[in-house]
């Protein structure tokens, strides 16, 4: 067996005795190809491809996420985290997890099949009305109320991570960066999420709690109303500076006062002033506008008609390549702002989640980790210290220097190793510049 598969089996065996599994279990011996019939590909989830499937024992339709551990070596901890959180959840508002199976280097994760698409998909044919927005937000709030009561934080709430069944049921999905709080650890301070939806305190890496999900919900409310989050036209790195520094986004346009007030309540820069999910369920926008979830089937039908027309117009397009788990999706990649920043070095997670000490150190050597750039300590930090010293001496602007330094470190968080690449490219360009006589023309 491949070393990565061995590592996976070791970690799960270590954990299995302590983990509660309301929704499923992990089986390292059964052959998933005998237990399940894999049908058409329906999307791309976090870490792997998602297929529609049949449980041969019950004839139940399921979603099968298949991950090649050889190709997902950098994401093993995140995959384990997603399974850990899902296996601990038992709520009609959270995607159900039925079990995991390991076959050679392929991990099969069996989940609830949700054929209605994601909330992001439903935006593709056109805008939603406020009744539809309120109904979706109410169901997200029910999911968040459940998670927060279990001391869990989703940390990546956005329309792409909200899935619907064909009957209009709304469920939270994609728990690859979800966090667990305990009685002794009431806040977290790791930098994860998707930039446009991230709360200011998360970006600043301050201590944060479930109120970070409420901020993301407010951004999602704007996304559902306008089709995209605020600042979606900007580079994500720029947005990471704007969110903590600027006033909170507001919902502009021809929307009702209650919806605008709902968004404003969620997007308070001070986390303690944001309402809880339970309190937001009583907000007048929700109470006045939300209907039964069956009302959303009209949206799902609209999306399916739109998708069929798109396929007919462009038969060469591969509409099955979506980005969420278990959805019958139409490839709703609305731009570069969808990506999620995942935790690089998970802290000691509680309640049976993987601890660093649980892993065989020798086997861990088989999984190369992308290191942070060496130039951060050898070049970048000393350089900025020198710049700040010189700037102070002549009364310069220290804030701009700190912003530039922060941008480099945020880029490194998102893409470890990028600073070394940048410095190497700069050196090459400087060498070419000097060889060409300082860039002056010879004619």
UniProtKB/Swiss-Prot annotation:
Query: PROSITE patterns, from UniProt?
Result: PROTEIN_KINASE_ATP, PROTEIN_KINASE_DOM
Keywords associated with the record:
Acetylation, Apoptosis, ATP-binding, Cytoplasm, Kinase, Magnesium, Membrane, Metal-binding, Nucleotide-binding, Nucleus, Phosphoprotein, Serine/threonine-protein kinase, Transferase
Q: Using the UniProt record, name the top-level EC class of this enzyme in a single word.
A: transferase
Q: Which residues carry this modification: Phosphothreonine?
A: 18, 190
Name the segments for region: Disordered. 309-337
What is this enzyme's EC? 2.7.11.1
Q: Which residues form the active site?
A: 156 (proton acceptor)
Q: Where is the Protein kinase domain?
A: 36-286
Q: Where is this motif: Bipartite nuclear localization signal?
A: 278-292
How changing residue 321 to N affects the protein? Answer: Loss of proteolytic cleavage by caspases
InterPro entries the record matches: Kinase-like_dom_sf, PDC10_dimerisation_sf, PDCD10_N, Prot_kinase_dom, Protein_kinase_ATP_BS, STE20/SPS1-PAK
Result of changing residue 18 to A: Loss of phosphorylation by PKA
Q: Which GO terms are recorded in the biological process aspect for this UniProt protein? A: cellular response to oxidative stress; cellular response to starvation; execution phase of apoptosis; intracellular signal transduction; intrinsic apoptotic signaling pathway in response to oxidative stress; negative regulation of cell migration; protein autophosphorylation; protein phosphorylation
Cellular component GO terms held in the UniProt record: cytoplasm; cytosol; extracellular exosome; FAR/SIN/STRIPAK complex; Golgi apparatus; membrane; nucleolus; nucleoplasm
Query: What's an example of a GO molecular-function annotation for this chain?
Result: ATP binding
Q: Where does it live in the cell? A: Cytoplasm; Nucleus; Membrane
Task: Give the family per the record.
Answer: Belongs to the protein kinase superfamily. STE Ser/Thr protein kinase family. STE20 subfamily.
Note the subunit structure: Monomer. Interacts with CTTNBP2NL. Interacts with RIPOR1 (via C-terminus); this interaction occurs in a PDCD10-dependent and Rho-independent manner. Interacts with PDCD10; this interaction is required for the association of STK24 with RIPOR1. Part of the core of STRIPAK complexes composed of PP2A catalytic and scaffolding subunits, the striatins (PP2A regulatory subunits), the striatin-associated proteins MOB4, STRIP1 and STRIP2, PDCD10 and members of the STE20 kinases, such as STK24 and STK26.
Q: What is this protein called?
A: Serine/threonine-protein kinase 24
Q: Gene behind this chain?
A: STK24
């Amino acid at each position: 067996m491949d070393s990565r598969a061995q590592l996976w089996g070791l970690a799960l065996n270590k954990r299995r005795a302590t983990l509660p599994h309301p929704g499923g279990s992990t089986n390292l011996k059964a052959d998933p190809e005998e237990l399940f019939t894999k049908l058409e590909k329906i999307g791309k989830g976090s870490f792997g491809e998602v297929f529609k499937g049949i449980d041969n024992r019950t004839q139940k339709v399921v979603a099968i996420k298949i991950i090649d551990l050889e190709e997902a070596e950098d994401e093993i901890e995140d995959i384990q985290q997603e399974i850990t959180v899902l296996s601990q959840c038992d709520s009609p508002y959270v995607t159900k997890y039925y079990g995991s199976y390991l076959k050679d280097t392929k991990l099969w994760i069996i989940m609830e099949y949700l054929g209605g698409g994601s909330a992001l998909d439903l935006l593709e044919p056109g805008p939603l009305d406020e009744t539809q927005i309120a109904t979706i937000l109410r169901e997200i709030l029910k999911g968040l109320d459940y998670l927060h009561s279990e001391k869990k934080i989703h940390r990546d709430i956005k329309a792409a991570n909200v899935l619907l069944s064909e009957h209009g049921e709304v469920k939270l999905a994609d728990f690859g960066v979800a966090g667990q709080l305990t009685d002794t650890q009431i806040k977290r301070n790791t930098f994860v999420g998707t930039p446009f939806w991230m709360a200011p305190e998360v970006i600043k890496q301050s201590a944060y709690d479930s109120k970070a999900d409420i901020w993301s919900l407010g951004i999602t409310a704007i996304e559902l109303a306008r089709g995209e989050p605020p600042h979606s036209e900007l580079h994500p790195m720029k947005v990471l500076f704007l969110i903590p520094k600027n006033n909170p986004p507001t919902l502009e346009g021809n929307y009702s006062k209650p919806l605008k007030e709902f968004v404003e309540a969620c997007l308070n820069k001070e986390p303690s002033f944001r309402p809880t999910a339970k309190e937001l369920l009583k907000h007048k926008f929700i109470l006045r506008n939300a209907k039964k979830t069956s009302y959303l089937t009209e949206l799902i039908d609209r999306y399916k008609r739109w998708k069929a027309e798109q396929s007919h117009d462009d038969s060469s397009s591969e509409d099955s390549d979506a980005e969420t788990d278990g959805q019958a999706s139409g490839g709703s990649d609305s731009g570069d702002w969808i990506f999620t920043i995942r935790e690089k070095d998970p802290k000691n997670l509680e309640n049976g989640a993987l601890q660093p000490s649980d892993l065989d150190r020798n086997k861990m050597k088989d999984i190369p980790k992308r290191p942070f750039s060496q130039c951060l300590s050898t070049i970048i930090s000393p350089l900025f210290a020198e710049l700040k010293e010189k700037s102070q001496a002549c009364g310069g602007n220290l804030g701009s220097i700190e912003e530039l330094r922060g941008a480099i470190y945020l880029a490194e968080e998102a893409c470890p190793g990028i600073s070394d690449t940048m410095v190497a490219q700069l050196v090459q360009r400087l060498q070419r510049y000097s060889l060409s006589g300082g860039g002056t023309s010879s004619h």
